[in-house]
């Protein structure tokens, strides 16, 4: 199916952001951990001060995952609106029967 989670690869070569059957995998980092975003509704709300300054060492709500996602998005130039942002919007176009065949 098109919703299999992406598995980390052992090599750190260049990889596409998405391919036909692994579209839910939007971010792949060759670091200690890999951030995988699956097509389920996940809302990350960031408070005002972080939206203006994006400090790299800030932890949002005690969750380092939220801070990591915010840091990755801000470092790649993805705008984050003042009302927070919805990660499901990034993968919403891959839902239902719109999965491309392998």
From Swiss-Prot:
InterPro entries: Keratin (IPR003461). The modification N-acetylserine is found at residue 1. The keyword Acetylation applies. Keywords: Acetylation, Keratin. One of its GO terms (cellular component) is intermediate filament. The keyword Acetylation applies. One of its GO terms (molecular function) is structural constituent of cytoskeleton. The avian keratins (F-ker, S-ker, C-ker and B-ker) are a complex mixture of very similar polypeptides. Belongs to the avian keratin family. This is Feather keratin. The lineage of its organism: Eukaryota, Metazoa, Chordata, Craniata, Vertebrata.
